[in-house]
A protein has these predicted regions:
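Short beta-strand-centered aromatic/proline hotspots
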Residues: 280-281, 287-303
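Substrate-contacting helices/loops that form the catalytic groove of nucleic-acid
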Residues: 72-278, 322-347
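Short acidic-glycine loop/turn motifs at beta-strand connectors
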Residues: 8-10, 71-75, 285-287, 296-297
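SH3/SH3-like beta-barrel fold
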Residues: 68-70, 300-306
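Gly/Thr-rich phosphate-binding beta-strand-loop-beta motif of the actin/hexokinase/Hsp70
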Residues: 53-72
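Charged, flexible boundary elements
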Residues: 17-51
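Low-complexity, highly charged intrinsically disordered N-terminal segments
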Residues: 1-18
Length: 347
């Protein structure tokens, strides 16, 4: 069963409540409905503070998908399976190719700048770990998170362990993420073999199908990590998944790379589409809930929230109703069969 996050009138996250309790508070006028990037929550109208318990976030990093669990001693509030950010490396390669091509035209607008080396994290690595930090900050606005526990992944080889620790993008990005998390809440880590031992002790299985949208793919490890800190359960009490995928928005691209008829490149990219911020969730009378994509000739394109498939390209901006800003797609999977949930718990 999913609990409803509760936020006080001053914006402080409180302990989540039962859906029936949330409906009662809304009916009596003590709370208002709100929606934040795929998650429903309530905001109290009169209460500005409250007593909270320890809530832990477990994170299982991955190369393609990642698991995140929000859990207290009494309940498992949320399981998130997030798609990793994987498009930045190819985007930077295309950017470098475009810059290189501009250097060899008749009018070289882009001069070589070999002495402008960029320090810090590689863009693709930073985007991966920033994505985890964005999700964590989002959860901190809705849940009273007191601690974060992460499975400590390593990129060390037998030949050059010192080189890997100091220069490997994975190791450097991981340490950057750990430093940022410690600025927010306390952090604890477990090795991969320790996570497996705890999972085997509880009798939990992990599937080999890493791309499957099931609890046993990644969230089983994030749940085990959170349960190791806060305790309370011998078996998962909530295995329902909220699948999250980041939107790939071409913010700084002004036109298509390949010229069209007559050598003219059509406009492409940007952050806004006829007054709408790209990725914003809207309601259409025919297609229902969708999000805004690109724009062309006074029309905007709408995309399906579940899988990002384009629904249409000729929607008038006046035909849609703006609902919320969003930078990712979120879909709540149905309750798994045979997990002991009652029908009234999923309404």
């Amino acid at each position: 069963m999913l609990f409803v996050p509760v936020v006080s009138s001053s914006g402080k996250p409180l302990m989540p409540c039962h859906p029936a309790r949330a409906r009662e508070l809304i009916r009596k006028g003590k709370a208002i409905r709100q929606f934040d990037r795929g998650l429903f929550f309530i905001r109290l109208t009169a209460r500005s503070d409250g007593v909270t318990q320890d809530v832990v976030v477990g994170i299982d990093p991955g190369s393609k998908k990642e698991g995140i669990t929000v859990k207290s001693e009494a309940h498992t509030y949320l399981n998130i399976q997030a798609d990793a950010v994987t498009h930045v490396k190819e985007a930077k390669a295309d950017q470098a190719a475009s810059r290189r091509a501009r250097r060899f035209r008749k009018t070289p607008y882009r001069q070589p700048r070999a002495n402008r080396t960029r320090g810090g994290l590689p863009p693709s690595t930073k985007a991966r770990w920033q994505w985890k930090l964005r999700l964590l900050n989002w959860l901190r606005r809705l849940f009273p998170i007191s601690q974060v526990v992460v499975e400590d992944i390593k990129a060390q080889t037998q030949g050059k362990p010192r080189w890997d620790t100091a220069f490997s993008p994975l190791e450097v990005g991981k340490q950057w993420f750990y430093d940022e998390v410690r600025k927010l809440v306390s952090l604890d880590t477990f090795e991969g073999y320790e996570t497996k031992q705890m999972r085997d002790t509880l009798g939990l299985k992990k599937t080999k199908k890493k791309m499957a949208d099931v609890f046993e793919a990644h969230c089983v490890d994030s749940w085990v990590l959170a349960n190791a800190i806060v305790g309370g359960h011998a078996q998962p009490d909530n295995t329902r998944l909220l699948c999250v995928s980041p939107l790939q928005i071409h913010r700084r691209e002004l036109h298509r790379r390949q010229p069209g008829v007559g050598g003219v490149r059509s406009p492409y990219g940007g952050t806004r589409s006829l007054g709408f911020k790209r990725g914003s969730t809207v309601r259409h009378p025919k297609y229902g809930i969708a999000y805004v994509g690109g724009a062309s000739e006074g029309r905007i394109s709408l995309h399906r929230v579940e899988d990002g498939k384009r629904l249409c390209q000729n929607t008038k901006p006046s035909d849609v109703q703006f609902l919320a800003y969003s930078t990712w797609r979120a879909r709540l999977l149905p309750v798994p069969e045979g997990r002991g949930f009652r029908r009234e718990e999923i309404r």
